Amino acid sequence: MKPGTIELGNASVRVGYPQIIAPNQRGHARELTEFFVSEEYRGKGEGSALLKEVCEQADQGKLMLIMIADSLRLASFYARHGFIAIQANPILMARTPAS
């Protein structure tokens, strides 16, 4: 499965994409700089499935994910996936790899 795709029946549908960068070459953290889900797939669980895939890949690489949530609604979404707020304004969130 390509990043940003979800298997729906026998078809693979691109529902959105994550963009992840390494803030520095030596660290074990990656910044989730963009997380986009196509409007037609919002509110249907596909964004959660995509973020779950991103988190699983980060866990395999033992990578911390960091990101800025643009709103409390988004912060709540990321919190459901293991991110915690580490700064209030802007809302900076981090997720440590699962053991």
Model-derived features: positions:
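Conserved acetyl-CoA pyrophosphate-binding loop and the N-cap/start of the following alpha-helix
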Residues: 41, 45-53
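Conserved catalytic-core motifs of GNAT/GCN5-like acyltransferases
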Residues: 79, 84-98
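Conserved acyl-donor/pantetheine-binding loop and adjacent beta-alpha core of acyl/acetyltransferases
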Residues: 1-36, 99
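Hydrophobic beta-strand residues in large extracellular and virion-surface proteins
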Residues: 13-15, 32-37, 50-51, 65, ...
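Conserved GNAT acetyl-CoA-binding A-motif
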Residues: 58-70
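Glycine-centered loop/turn motif at secondary-structure junctions
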Residues: 9-10, 62, 79-82
